[in-house]
Amino acid sequence: MQQLEKQSDLASWHGRLSLTYEKKAHQTQVQQSYHQAPLNLQRPFYPEGPVCHSVMMHTAGGMVGGDRLSINVTLQPQTHALLTTTSAGKVYRSNGHGAQQTVQCQLDTNAILEWLPLGTIVFDQAQFRQTLQVELGPGAIFCGWDLTRFGRSARGERFMQGDWRSHTEIWQQGAPLWIDRQWLPGQPDIWESPHGLAGQPVVGSFLWVGQGVEPNLVQTARDLWQPTTDGAEMGVTRLPLGLVCRYRGPSSQAARQWFIQVWNLLRSTHLGRPACPPRVWPL
């Protein structure tokens, strides 16, 4: 048994990515970068001047049981970075072990991080746990989203077996600003339940945390959603220092398009610059 566990461990990926951003010559730059396969980072680009756009890559194509990914991001004072991915991540059916991803972000004074990965496809019978921990310094802002598709819908696959857990925490100077724990076991009754997926394969969350949002902008965010006839549902909630949007429905693209509109709204009103979708996005 121990020999089998050792073989499984050797066959698993333990990917790491560590990034530190600094403000230099009126521009945010990558000061330090360390990566361990299968995680990697493309060369940063600057489509909007001082903001550093960085693209993360998973060169193995997806995660299997036993894989572990660890991402650490540090933003020094006054920096502004946007991180995204080249494609949606994939979590394949479990081999008896779980896959996990841990992201830790430290934002110093007045730093801004936009965490905008393209999403995750969780295959039937997958076991996946993801954790996001963010620590905000004074005046710092975290903007991020998470989009998950349960099952390969185009093949008629649904998430009938498996286990998915997501844990997000955002703190500022010892005070919790947002804590969100989600658990979705793969079961037919959970798939159909209105308290689960309600028969819909896609769920998503958009977060803006660290700076207050006026009530009129909350209503504007709701109005940006275009009602559909496919059973999709949305919601927007104002936080003491931010805003959260939720989506449940059939379309990752529809959710992403709405999130981009909300992102553009908050960027324009709070940062004085419109949204600038990264060039790698399939828009």
From Swiss-Prot:
UreD, UreF and UreG form a complex that acts as a GTP-hydrolysis-dependent molecular chaperone, activating the urease apoprotein by helping to assemble the nickel containing metallocenter of UreC. The UreE protein probably delivers the nickel. It is found in: Cytoplasm. Disulfide bonds: none annotated. Its main location: cytoplasm. GO terms for cellular component: cytoplasm. The lineage of its organism: Bacteria, Bacillati, Cyanobacteriota, Cyanophyceae, Acaryochloridales. GO terms for molecular function: nickel cation binding. The keyword rRNA-binding does not apply. Belongs to the UreD family. Required for maturation of urease via the functional incorporation of the urease nickel metallocenter. It comes from the Bacteria. InterPro entries: UreD. Keywords: Chaperone, Cytoplasm, Nickel insertion. This is Urease accessory protein UreD. It comes from Acaryochloris marina (strain MBIC 11017).
